[in-house]
Each structure stands twice: as C-alpha cells, then as structure tokens.
Curated annotation (Swiss-Prot):
Family stated for the protein in its record: Belongs to the tetraspanin (TM4SF) family.
Name of this protein: Tetraspanin-9
Listed transmembrane segments: 13-33, 56-76, 86-106, 204-224
Entry's localization field: Membrane
Organism, as annotated: Salmo salar
SUPFAM superfamilies named among the record's database cross-references: Tetraspanin (SSF48652)
Sequence ranges on the Cytoplasmic membrane side: 1-12, 77-85, 225-239
Topological relation to the membrane, as annotated: Multi-pass membrane protein
Amino acid sequence: MARGCLCCVKYMLFLFNLLFWLGGCGLLGVGVWLSVSQGSFATLSPSFPSISAANLIITLGAVIMVTGFLGCLGAIKENKCLLLSFFITLLVILLAELILLILFFVYTDNVSENARQDLKEGLALYSTNNNAGLRNAWNTIQTEWHCCGVNGYTDWHTALQEKVVPDHCCQDIYQDCGRNATNQFWTRGCYEKVEEWLDDNKHLLGTIAMCVLVIQLLGMAFSMTLYQQIHRSGKKYEA
C-alpha cells in the first residue's frame, strides 16, 4: 500500500515537472530566437539595457528548465537530495516573488515616476544605429495601442530635438506623416494606456498569479510528500 502511494506521488511529480521543463524549453527557444532575430528587442530602458524582452524570457526559461529538471530527476530516481533541492528552489522563487510584490506596492509611486522618466530618456535612442529592436517595439506599441510617446506626443519633440514624431504616432500612417499637423497624431501617452490596460485586466492578471502560486505550492507539496515517503521507506539516495 505504501509502495503504491509512493509510485503514485512519484509519477505525478514527474509528469508535473516534465510539463514544467518543456515549458521552460519553449520559453528559452523563444528568447534565443528574439535575441538572434531582433537584437535588443524591446529594450526600452537606457538605464537597464540588459533588461530586454529576449533576456527576460531566456532567464525565465532557464530557471524553469533547471527547476523542472531537478524535479523530474529527483522524482524518477527517488533521490532525497534532488527532491530537497527542488523544494528549496521553489521556496526561494516564491519568497523572491513575495518580496518583489511587497516592494512594488510599497514603492508604487516611486517605481512609476522612475519608469516614466527612464522611458522618456530611452526615446532618444529611437533613431540611433543598432536599435532596430527598440524602434520595432515603440512602433508596435504606438500602432496597436493608439498612443504616442510616454506621456504624450510632445515627448518625441524633446527626444528627437525637433517638432516631429514617428510615423506610427499618426492615426492614418503614411510616409512622413509625423511631420504634419498635430491633430493627426494620437494624443494619449503610452504609459497611461498601459496603466489603463492593467487596471481593466487586473482580475485576469490576478487569476494568472493565483494559478502560478497554486502550481508552485503543488510542486512543493508533491516533492515534500515524496521526500517523506522515501524517508519512511528507508531508501537511501545515491551520492
């Protein structure tokens, strides 16, 4: 009976982490593709040039892959050392998420103001060489979200040092439309649009966050259950 419970928990944990590992592989592949094909894709912040969409996805994918690998190997080998490492890894990730969340809510105003200022400074890189990723990111954001600049279209006047905006700020996009009358531009800033979108989708984002939390807690519960089952059965892990 005990052995049957052990096998059940073992294979549940293995399948759980196999899906986890495959998801990490997928994210890592997407991150590498973005890095190779788009360069510094979506590197909107000049203060943190390494924080790009590609690098964030690669880092996230690598962490998920390593965590999933520890869980898979620990489960299939019934190795207490690996299972404990898996549990500790998930616990550290969970604590880091909670700390970041608390800091974000405590310093929301400071984070928001610094983000606005940093993004405005990043607009100056729009027309520079080797920043195709940044240009593509801003062009996509302004076209899809019907916005212009960080706080408004005048941000571009300061950044580009002349009274023009990128053509993707125009309500009807055509060559050099950014040099025409301002009544043809989207007037709302993109930062405001993003804040509005986050507010409109806060319930969806909260649900996703809860799902991630449940997955982490399940992984920790499965690993500790299997660890205890192995410990009680007296099985020694291999060095």
